[in-house]
């Protein structure tokens, strides 16, 4: 598991009250992990702070699964 993957899963776990080791990469934040729209906004802010990146609103709409968050952060960190 990459450092980015671990950090994304940890942020998701903290935000949604889950255990990081139980979070699967293919899990949908809303459908599988029970997140609501406010949780998603807070997750995006958490990713921005944790990785020191900026995620525009139009991009945040594409971050719907754990894997899409990992892929997005990886791309932004280049």
Swiss-Prot record:
GO terms for biological process: lipid A biosynthetic process. This is Acyl carrier protein. It is found in: Cytoplasm. Keywords: Cytoplasm, Fatty acid biosynthesis, Fatty acid metabolism, Lipid biosynthesis, Lipid metabolism, Phosphopantetheine, Phosphoprotein. Pathway: Lipid metabolism; fatty acid biosynthesis. One of its GO terms (molecular function) is acyl carrier activity. Belongs to the acyl carrier protein (ACP) family. One of its GO terms (cellular component) is membrane. The modification O-(pantetheine 4'-phosphoryl)serine is found at residue 37. Carrier of the growing fatty acid chain in fatty acid biosynthesis. Coiled coil: none annotated. It comes from the Bacteria. Its main location: cytoplasm. Residues 2-77 form the Carrier domain. InterPro entries: ACP (IPR003231), ACP-like_sf (IPR036736), PP-bd_ACP (IPR009081), Ppantetheine_attach_site (IPR006162).
């Amino acid at each position: 598991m990459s450092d980015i993957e671990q950090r994304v899963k940890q942020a998701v776990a903290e935000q949604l009250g889950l255990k990081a080791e139980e979070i699967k990469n293919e899990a949908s934040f809303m459908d599988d992990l029970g997140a609501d729209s406010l949780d998603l906004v807070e997750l995006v802010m958490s990713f921005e702070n944790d990785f020191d990146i900026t995620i525009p609103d139009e991009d945040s709409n594409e971050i719907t699964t754990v894997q899409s968050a990992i892929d997005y952060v990886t791309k932004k960190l280049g």
